[in-house]
Each structure stands twice: as C-alpha cells, then as structure tokens.
Amino acid sequence: MIIARTVRELQEAKKELNGSIGFVPTMGALHQGHLSLIQQAKKENDHLIVSIFVNPTQFLEGEDLNAYPRREEADRKICEVAGVDIVFMPEIGQMYEKDELCIGAPAIRGYILEGEKRPGHFDGMLQVVMKLLNLSSATRAYFGKKDAQQLSLITQMVKNYFMDVQIIPCEIIRDEYGLALSSRNVYLNEEEKHRALALSRSLKRATKMVMQGELDVEAIKKEMMQVLSETDRVEYIAIVDRQFKALEKVQIGNTIILVAAWIGKPRLIDNIWI
C-alpha cells in the first residue's frame, strides 16, 4: 500500500495502476461504515484509492475543525488490511490555493435542510469532492446514503460538469441496536447512545405507518416528533422526493425521510429511503 501525501506523489502512484479505479473519499476516523464502502469498491474495481482529508472549507464558523476526530495510524491499518492500493492523505496546502476558483451548491437544493442549518457547508464539500474525483481518476466513487443530501448534490455535480465517473450510493451501516454509524458517535456516552436510537426508531415508525397505508406527510412527522422527544433538540424532520422537493404525500419508491437532532455534544443525522 502506498501513502501519498502530495498531489505529485498521488499522480506518480497512479501510473502503476491499470484497469478500473474505485475511490472512497473520507475525512478519516474510519469505522465499519467506511469499511463497507471500501470493501464494495475493492470488489467492484481493479484498484482502490482512499482519501483521508479533513476538509476545512466545509466547517462553519463555530464548528471546531480541530476537534474532529483524527486517528491516522489506525486508519492506515484499516486501509492496509482492506487491500487499499493508495491512501491519499494531503495537507491543506496541497488541496487549496489562495484566491482560487470555487464552485457552489445550487441555490435551492444546496441551502435547505443541512444547507440551511450549515450555510456554505455544501459549497466546501462540493469543491473538495470535485478536486478529489479529478485527482483520483476514479472509474467509480462510493458514498453512503446516510448523507443523502450530499449524495444528491454530488450526483448532480458529476452530471452538470460532465465528469467521467460513476457515483455509487451505498446502504447505511448501523450498529447492532440500529444507530447509524458516524465518526461523531465517539462523542456519545452510553446514556446518549441509548437516546440517539430515537432517530432510527422514528424512521422505523414512519416506515411502519407508510406500510400500513398512511401517506400524509404531516401525520407521519407528528408521530416521528413524539419518538424524537428523547433527543435534546430536533433540528428538522423532512419528507422529500429524490430531488429533495418537499412532499405532501409519500410517494412509494421516490421518497426520502430525513431527520437531524442533537444528542449531547454531537448533531446526528439519519434517513430512510422508501
């Protein structure tokens, strides 16, 4: 396994790769959710590149970039055991120049839900993902459905900019109790982990209602809010179609139900596709 810390080192390492390239971009602090992406990419491609880069431009004022969990040695071992060919671990100066051109999230889809609560977050995310996709020369890039709005925007970016890469959505990985895996879960104590299960329980409640014939969005949200009373603060419940347009009625096969809530220190998100 090659560790590339500069763009030049990555470009040199890629010269040894022949065939399809799978790419998994991460911010490190790898967990089983990341590993599932890596394993799928390994299975479906001749070669595999993983990036580990805590991107400063997607952190907002007041969000502590320096507090984001970093476990470089552990992450490297996970990648090595998983059979990754190249791990790209650049410093900030490798990824950004002063006064560079920027791309931005679309005015509507990029500034609702996560984009409304964290304005500018998706601008920074799309900027770095475009750079990483170009640098990796990926045939396929793998993203989890847990960040559903991010996945939607990346897919749109690739289409709008005619980028020659296939975006592969991957299922949400949960722990044995149903909590969606996240690097931010390390901030939860045992009591908070138990309360955090309210997110997945609220989504299960919504799914059960839909399966029983209840399609009214407001009725479903009301039931979900009751389940989410165990959280410290609910930031949003949203029921949208795959293009992130708000719905009045659930459309089977074209609906995403999303929730964001605070539990102790971290802000957690979860969703289900119906």
From Swiss-Prot:
Its EC number is 6.3.2.1. CDD domains: PanC (cd00560). (R)-pantoate binds at residues 58, 150. Pathway: Cofactor biosynthesis; (R)-pantothenate biosynthesis; (R)-pantothenate from (R)-pantoate and beta-alanine: step 1/1. Beta-alanine binds at residue 58. GO terms for cellular component: cytosol. It is an enzyme of class 6 (ligase). One of its GO terms (biological process) is pantothenate biosynthetic process. ATP binds at residues 27-34, 144-147, 173, 181-184. Its main location: cytoplasm. It catalyses: (R)-pantoate + beta-alanine + ATP = (R)-pantothenate + AMP + diphosphate + H(+). The active site is at residue 34. One of its GO terms (molecular function) is ATP binding. It comes from the Bacteria. It is found in: Cytoplasm. Keywords: ATP-binding, Cytoplasm, Ligase, Nucleotide-binding, Pantothenate biosynthesis. Homodimer. Belongs to the pantothenate synthetase family. Catalyzes the condensation of pantoate with beta-alanine in an ATP-dependent reaction via a pantoyl-adenylate intermediate. PANTHER family: CYTIDYLATE KINASE/PANTOATE-BETA-ALANINE LIGASE (PTHR21299), PANTOATE--BETA-ALANINE LIGASE (PTHR21299:SF1). This is Pantothenate synthetase. It comes from Sulfurovum sp. (strain NBC37-1).
